[in-house]
């Protein structure tokens, strides 16, 4: 069926690794958590935009390593997904990050929710995949440290902001 409608427009792609490989969505949820955390800390739109951009760079690097086409990742399933996921309070991962940024514990957030923030469960796997493929994903690795290894959220954010300048 045709999913184009008055309020929604799709595009045509026939590239499995970039569209359905799960790489873009799995990576976008980590960027969303980080963006939510800086939102919860009141750090502003510029910081969130920087994290979103770094998250997109990670999606592209991992996608290319898995033979996805960069142009697919620059479409709706890449940029479209990460833009929505990193900016909308109805995004489960963004709202989880906001709650963490406001000082709530992961355990209390998870107990109070009826929906799943998939980033909580995929972070370690994506971090391991990136390591296995020798793909730099510092944002994803940092979110993994916060969610699964008890890293301090303020130190994690500071570490991301203090990373050496590089071409991204």
Where in the sequence are the language-model features?
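Short glycine/threonine-rich catalytic loop with a Thr-x-Gly-x-Asp
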Residues: 26-29, 117
